[in-house]
């Protein structure tokens, strides 16, 4: 018999230890649930409300943040992972696929590929769940595509009352806007409909370019392809520029990768361990060696190597090792100033042996501006650039600049685009590497450029910007988040207030405020709400 009415006992575990992919934190929830149906999710939420318990929903655990840490109830939807329906456009321009929200993105890839469809745009990995990938603002890198959530047609949510709520642009649009980037604080997404397109391959060019080449060509480089990203190696003063367009050409063998081999990977991680634990000053030399092994030494701008890959292989990437990650978004037009400032700071820090950075520093863009209305062109082809929108609503907690204005694809310039800069510090063989000095400087630089942090990453903040109880500086671990409540309230303003209003309406008993400290110190809830 189940220990919880309406939920099979096989879907409940005690003494479960949840660890995130990076191994930065773990949690021991009181109960760990893996429901198999929407009815079971409803039963869990209602029981939590009645018993005064709180719930965190987890998926693949790929967020390096501790936002999901809890010692109360934890729900994982890996067993709620079926495909429910595929509705195809009569003209074959797109299809709407409805899935249970626990399905992983890579599982959805397999289903869609077998039927000749693909997701329109992807982030760097496909391990996340369909419900989780939108909950923190996942994005790819393109001057035409925005947040992954813009592909979603509708959602079904189990809110804090234990009610099933259907959401789309016409039904509860305010709740839909909150749920498309909810941080798990509204309820549990149990079902989603996603707009997909006919499967396509990507013809990409990968070039080694000098750092100054990137800056000199900043005005045109970001709108030169539908998909584009750049990896910056400051100690080599070079970048790797990857650009891709849709194609009907057949896929070929993927590019060779030195660190993709067993030996190359082991050598790289071992050298990183040496720089972290024995001799930090070796870091620039190690990074130069690694760059030469992977990419060579010669600039190939305008003459890069080409490849044709499936959209999945082209857009996903190898994230290498366990890592701390701090990513911020700011207007793309501020990019040259930001990169020059970071470049100077990194060089000065290395010269003074103050701190050393790991590479690459990932530089990406997105177009999160939205038209007032959209109709898919009658003559849209498989290789046509740009999105087929699932909805035209901006999530309240979207961290990209809100003042940017939409332009048709033919008129897109840097003025429509958001710049994402991603600072990564590896944890070789699980070793915690110091990050505080580098990430603090990084955050100060991006904040001054109109930036805001990615919700799911390792942003630190400071005791001056946190809310709730704070400790003295020497009581914090180097990598521990301090909080950014005052800044977040300033940045998001009325959008945050509207999100909080929706959250209170959908979860009046605070069932989904499990990690209270994280939510308070980052301004998602006010501390007095916990006493109400």
Swiss-Prot record:
GO cellular component: a single term: mitochondrion
Catalysed conversion reaction: D-arabinono-1,4-lactone + O2 = dehydro-D-arabinono-1,4-lactone + H2O2 + H(+)
Coiled-coil regions, chain positions: none
Claim: Heme is one of the keywords in the record: no
EC number from the UniProt entry: 1.1.3.37
Transmembrane segments: none
GO molecular function terms attached to this record: D-arabinono-1,4-lactone oxidase activity; FAD binding
Cofactor(s) required, per the database record: FAD
Sorted UniProt keywords: FAD, Flavoprotein, Membrane, Mitochondrion, Oxidoreductase
Entry keyword annotation includes Ligase: no
Broad class of the protein's primary localization: mitochondrion
NCBIfam families: FAD_lactone_ox
Family to which this protein belongs: Belongs to the oxygen-dependent FAD-linked oxidoreductase family.
Name of the protein in question: D-arabinono-1,4-lactone oxidase
Native organism: Eremothecium gossypii (strain ATCC 10895 / CBS 109.51 / FGSC 9923 / NRRL Y-1056) (Yeast)
Gene: ALO1
């Amino acid at each position: 018999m189940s220990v919880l009415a309406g939920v099979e006992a096989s879907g409940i575990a005690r003494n479960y230890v949840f660890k995130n992919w990076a191994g930065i934190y773990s949690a021991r929830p009181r109960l760990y649930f893996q429901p198999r149906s929407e009815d079971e999710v409803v039963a869990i939420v209602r029981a939590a409300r009645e018993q005064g318990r709180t719930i965190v929903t987890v998926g693949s655990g790929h967020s390096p943040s501790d936002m999901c840490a809890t010692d109360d109830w934890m729900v994982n939807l890996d067993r709620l992972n079926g495909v429910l329906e595929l509705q195809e456009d009569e003209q074959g321009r797109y299809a709407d696929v409805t899935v249970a929200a626990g399905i992983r993105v890579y599982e959805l890839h397999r289903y869609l590929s077998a039927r000749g469809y693909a997701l329109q745009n992807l982030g760097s990995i496909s391990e996340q769940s369909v419900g989780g990938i939108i909950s923190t603002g996942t994005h790819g890198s393109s001057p035409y595509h925005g947040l992954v959530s813009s592909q979603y047609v509708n959602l079904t949510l189990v809110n804090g009352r234990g009610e099933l709520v259907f959401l789309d642009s016409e039904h509860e649009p305010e709740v839909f806007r909150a749920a498309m980037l909810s941080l798990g604080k509204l309820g549990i997404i149990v079902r989603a409909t996603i707009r997909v397109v006919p499967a396509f391959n990507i013809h990409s060019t990968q070039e080694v370019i000098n750092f100054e080449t990137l800056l000199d060509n900043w005005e045109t480089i970001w709108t030169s392809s539908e998909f584009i990203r750049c990896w910056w190696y400051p100690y080599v003063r070079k970048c790797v520029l990857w650009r891709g367009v849709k194609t009907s050409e057949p896929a070929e063998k993927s590019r060779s990768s030195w660190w993709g081999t067993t030996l190359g990977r082991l050598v790289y991680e071992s050298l990183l361990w040496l720089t972290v634990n024995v001799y930090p000053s070796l870091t620039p030399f190690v990074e130069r060696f690694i760059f030469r092994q992977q990419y060579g030494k010669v600039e190939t701008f305008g003459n890069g190597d080409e490849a044709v890959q499936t959209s999945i292989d082209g857009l996903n990437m190898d994230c290498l090792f366990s890592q701390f990650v701090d990513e911020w978004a700011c207007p793309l037009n501020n990019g040259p100033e930001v990169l020059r400032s970071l470049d100077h700071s990194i060089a000065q820090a290395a010269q003074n042996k103050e701190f050393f950075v790991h590479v690459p520093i990932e530089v990406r863009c997105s177009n999160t501006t939205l038209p007032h209305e959209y109709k898919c062109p009658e003559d849209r082809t498989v290789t046509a650039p740009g999105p087929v929108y699932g909805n035209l609503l901006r999530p309240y907690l979207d961290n990209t600049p809100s003042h940017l204005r939409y332009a048709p694809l033919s008129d897109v310039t840097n003025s429509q685009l958001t710049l994402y800069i991603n600072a990564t510090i590896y944890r070789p063989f699980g070793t915690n590497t110091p990050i505080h000095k580098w990430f603090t400087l990084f955050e100060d630089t991006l904040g001054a450029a109109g930036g805001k942090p990615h919700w799911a990453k390792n942003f630190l903040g400071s005791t001056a910007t946190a809310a709730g109880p704070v400790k003295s500086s020497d009581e914090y671990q180097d990598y521990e988040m301090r909080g950014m409540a005052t800044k977040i309230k300033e940045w998001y303003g009325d959008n945050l207030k509207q999100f909080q209003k929706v959250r209170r309406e959908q979860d009046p008993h605070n069932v989904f405020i499990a990690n209270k400290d994280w939510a308070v110190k980052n301004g998602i809830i006010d501390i007095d709400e916990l006493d109400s």
